[in-house]
Amino acid sequence: MIVFATILFGALSAEDPDVEKLDSQEFQRAVEERAFALGPEDHAPAGGEGQGAAGHRELRHPVGRAPSGGAGSDLEPGPLKVYDESQKVTGLLKPEGGGEPREFEYSYPEGYDIARVLNEANIPFTTDPQTAGPWARAIAVMAPFVLILLLFFLMTRTGRSASQSSRMTDFGKSRARRMTKDQPKVTFADVAGADEAVQELTEIKEFLENPQKFQKLGARIPKGALLVGPPGTGKTLLARAVAGEAGVPFFSISGSDFVEMFVGVGASRVRDLFEQAKQNSPCIIFVDEIDAVGRQRGAGLGGGHDEREQTLNQLLVEMDGFDSKSGIIMLAATNRPDILDPALLRPGRFDRQIVVDRPDLPGRIKILKVHTRGKPLGEDVDIETIARGTPGFTGADLANLVNEAALLAARHNKEQIEMAEMEEAIDRVIAGPERKTRLISEKEKEITAYHEAGHAIVGALLPEADPVHKVTIIPRGQALGVTMSLPEEDRFMMSRAQLMAQLSYMLGGRAAERVVFEEITTGASNDIERATKVARQMVTRYGMSEKLGLIALGQHDGQVFMGRDLHAQPDYSDEIAFQIDKEIRRLVDEAYDTAEDLLVRNRRLLEKLASDLIEYETVDAEHLRRLVEEYAVDEHPSRGRPAMSVNGHRG
């Protein structure tokens, strides 16, 4: 653009150095002396065609055409040229002392009657309203450049059209990413806490390496395996480990990558994906979050003909259509197996469902060892203690815990990660970071202290409740205070007594407020919500209601649009619903009365613990144990308490 503008400016401002510029006096003198080179004869015959205003000769030429001679001519003598628009006169001057005629140009002023002057002097001339001024020169100069730019634009447009056409052609191509040897390799050694899943997937690796081992026994390798489990348990990591161990092409794609706004694109991508897989057999196809495309059919807004269902239909055909000896194995992962289409889960498609659950204590120890590998740990760091203090944590939670501890150690300018950072990281993962700068009034601080003390005392005195690990009134996350507890061991079921103790523990904060202040606050809203949910499950799911008995209430009708759990239709009468509400209220009231009775009989313990919380802000398990031994009226047998906790209660 800069070069273009420079050339244009030069063309507009350029002047011909061979043209002699005449001023008014010089032009008048040339007229008087007839110094113009007019041709073989220096005078024009009188009369004839083309008479001007004064009856003298004026030669007219068509607009846009100029006679020979003048500007741009071959310097042949001829009549002068008068340009009315630009008010210029051009022509040739007689040579002085021999030589060639000289070209001249004269710009006459506004209102000057040039035709009258030339007619009176009997000088022939032609008139032309068009001017070959600077714009004409600019156009002449720029024409080649404009043509070049036009050709370049046309070539670019053609290339772009071809590219767009190519993109439209590739729109139906699979977006699967193929793992290459250059990418970081993940093996089964990097997977911990999922031994059963690793064992199941190891068979797939062995089949790809040595299929004859299975085929000679008449065994048919599973065509597909579905990894099922909560978020963060390592389903995708397991698939990557299979890719790293198998040494075969590995195609990875997300379930949402199949579906687009255009009809037929999803099915086309499925066909293309399996075509690529057949060309690279043996290989593995991994579909992450397959529930995005594999939801049960017939419940969408498209009337059974939406794009997602057509994609699923094509996927079902491809999975059951390719030869079992082709060496193509399908892996998929989901945390919502309940909403998948039954046809997708039948044998012959996904023959196996591999459950990847939350790790138990040995699994957490292994996972922590994997994530602390290569990190400088202090001598006081006990991996087993951390694992005991994190029941219910997934592999992703533990990885985040170790990373938070490393960040805290770096913030404190330490060379190693110590146990203090690990404990703080657990608290941050459970309840959020501390908010010491949050300003609360002394009255709110006192209410919070008694509220959390109520939770802690009920949890400490009820033998069926989980042991209390820490109580703090330092705001964390959205909570003004937190009481943390944890089970003594991994728990996979709960008794009715444990659930009732959990209800009393949840309502201990509200009971403490009423006992001490004879007033209640909004601080127990989350406690009440959680307690109501537990009580409802006891009545409608667990059959723990004495009046309603062993019956499950509130069955789902199978609607799967946006997930099965969205639509639940009561399968009981209004009378039963009334009894359910009464039973829920009875259970909650019973648990609340238990908590209130404990706090009334242990008022001195409540006052002392609240006072220590106001003074120290945080009370650990050992401090609480000493207070219980000293002030409790009816202490239950003490239980061994681990040094850490996870099940945070936000009061």
From Swiss-Prot:
GO terms for cellular component: plasma membrane. It is an enzyme of class 3 (hydrolase). The chain crosses the membrane at residues 135-155. Residues 1-134 are extracellular. Its EC number is 3.4.24.-. ATP binds at G229, P230, P231, G232, T233, G234, K235, T236. It is found in: Cell membrane. GO terms for molecular function: ATP binding; ATP hydrolysis activity; ATP-dependent peptidase activity; metalloendopeptidase activity; zinc ion binding. Its main location: membrane. Its cofactor is Zn(2+). It comes from the Bacteria. Binds 1 zinc ion per subunit. The keyword Protease applies. Acts as a processive, ATP-dependent zinc metallopeptidase for both cytoplasmic and membrane proteins. Plays a role in the quality control of integral membrane proteins. This is ATP-dependent zinc metalloprotease FtsH. The lineage of its organism: Bacteria, Bacillati, Actinomycetota, Rubrobacteria, Rubrobacterales.
